[in-house]
Amino acid sequence: MGETEGKVIAQNKKARHDYFIEETFEAGMVLQGTEIKSIRAGRANLKDSFARVSNGEVYLHNCHISEYEQGNRYNHEPTRARKLLLHKKQIDTLIGQTQQKGYTIVPLKIYIKNGFAKCLIGLGKGKKTFDKRETLRRRDAKREVERALKEKNR
């Protein structure tokens, strides 16, 4: 649903390895002043982060945004829960899908678009170990084919 246009700040590379991403949503983020300054400086990390719906609102948990270096005593807490801004229809879709067994909301990347910090979240279904191995095999086979075609064209 949402394609990134701006500068990518942080990516969750493990998300596509651990989950089948079925649908993506672009969400705005409610941030404090020092948080947006740290994000613009590229000091955000999505490792081990997840999103959860509570009271009809979506929150991003465990997203680490480092404290701003020039911040004073009013600096933000690095891993606090941050509210994500979505349309009501999108939230209802997420609520309905996450109540099914095995589905979760996974943050994929944080980026700046038109001056605003956005978070691309995906509706993911957990992969089993054999699915992960199959994905790796498929990717390796694709690399081998591309390598063979490249050498053939020389």
UniProtKB/Swiss-Prot annotation:
GO terms for cellular component: cytosol. InterPro entries: SmpB (IPR023620), SsrA-bd_prot (IPR000037), SsrA-bd_prot_CS (IPR020081). Belongs to the SmpB family. Required for rescue of stalled ribosomes mediated by trans-translation. Binds to transfer-messenger RNA (tmRNA), required for stable association of tmRNA with ribosomes. tmRNA and SmpB together mimic tRNA shape, replacing the anticodon stem-loop with SmpB. tmRNA is encoded by the ssrA gene; the 2 termini fold to resemble tRNA(Ala) and it encodes a 'tag peptide', a short internal open reading frame. During trans-translation Ala-aminoacylated tmRNA acts like a tRNA, entering the A-site of stalled ribosomes, displacing the stalled mRNA. CDD domains: SmpB. The gene is smpB. It is found in: Cytoplasm. Residues 134-154 are annotated as: Disordered. GO terms for biological process: trans-translation. GO terms for molecular function: RNA binding. This is SsrA-binding protein. Keywords: Cytoplasm, RNA-binding. It holds the Pfam family SmpB. It comes from Halalkalibacterium halodurans (strain ATCC BAA-125 / DSM 18197 / FERM 7344 / JCM 9153 / C-125) (Bacillus halodurans).
